[in-house]
Amino acid sequence: MILTITMNPSIDISYPLDVLNLDSVNRVTKVTKTAGGKGLNVTRVLKQLDADVLASGLLGGFFGDFIKNDLNINGIKHSFSDISGETRNCIAILHEGNQTEILESGPNISEKEANNFLRHFELLVDKANIISISGSLPLGISKDFYVKMLSICNKKDKRVVLDCSGEELRQVLKNDSKPFAIKPNIDELSDLLGVKVKDSIEDLKLILNTPMFNGIEWIVISMGAKGSFAKHNDKFYRVIIPKIQVVNPVGSGDSTIAGLTKGLNDGETDENVLKIANTLGMLNAQEHITGYVNMDNYKNLFEKIKVVEV
């Protein structure tokens, strides 16, 4: 079983408009509301791959119940830890080829609720083959919370695919409890290091060989239309992807994480792990809906991706 974790889930609301009129009334006829958050995007793609997946994290209030119901409708198993606060909304206004986002910060989690989740998480980890943890931490939870979760997983010899950035990732990298795999993009890597990272093979090799990344078996660097660069133990790979028509890139990183997690869980070769991950990321970018892939196009894209050891 694959366990996915979303610590700060949301209801993702999409408002498509021909024109956004500021300081005026804007009427929307077609509204889309889905269970959101990076980990739940990962979950939906894994479900489309027919993976045995269980979603967990923190949920509360009416909006938390909405998310549970949405997952039930889509046949996705879940086991969340309840909180007293209200799960957040994230609003995307699609207008004139632009996307304006209004993101609520979400509920403030108490120390008791955080500890309750850790106990719940430990029980779920026992049943999991691999764990995918994605996204930011909610208010009230310390930035080293992922370190605590990783410590639980490492003690049980369970692999973790971690997709986070900023201070959460810094805390992970400076501690002994490391994930099995991470997937920063070039901008997140630059923010982490405090310098502009170039996407040259030589520079990326030097960076990924620095001590801060010691103990992480897989590192995949997303480079958008340029594909990706990866390190697995002592091997480096350049992933070259075909040019595609991008419809909506939001959620492509989450789809890539789903593919990475699925490939690792299934014991695929290095080449196939990277091809699966990149194929799913591209498939998501070709859709209007976040966390959705059209598997009819999977084989065609998969066969066009090249993985070269460098």
Curated annotation (Swiss-Prot):
Reactions performed catalytically: D-tagatofuranose 6-phosphate + ATP = D-tagatofuranose 1,6-bisphosphate + ADP + H(+)
Presence of the UniProt keyword Nucleotide-binding in the record: yes
GO molecular function, one term: tagatose-6-phosphate kinase activity
Pfam families: PfkB
Gene Ontology biological process terms from the UniProt entry: D-tagatose 6-phosphate catabolic process; lactose catabolic process via tagatose-6-phosphate
Top-level taxon in the UniProt lineage: Bacteria
EC numbers on record: 2.7.1.144
Record's signal peptide: none
PROSITE patterns: PFKB_KINASES_2
Keywords, ordered alphabetically: ATP-binding, Kinase, Lactose metabolism, Nucleotide-binding, Transferase
Pathway stated in the Swiss-Prot or TrEMBL entry: Carbohydrate metabolism; D-tagatose 6-phosphate degradation; D-glyceraldehyde 3-phosphate and glycerone phosphate from D-tagatose 6-phosphate: step 1/2
CDD domains attached to this UniProt entry: FruK_PfkB_like (cd01164)
GO CC terms: cytosol
PANTHER family: 1-PHOSPHOFRUCTOKINASE, 1-PHOSPHOFRUCTOKINASE-RELATED
Protein family (similarity comment): Belongs to the carbohydrate kinase PfkB family. LacC subfamily.
Name this polypeptide is given: Tagatose-6-phosphate kinase
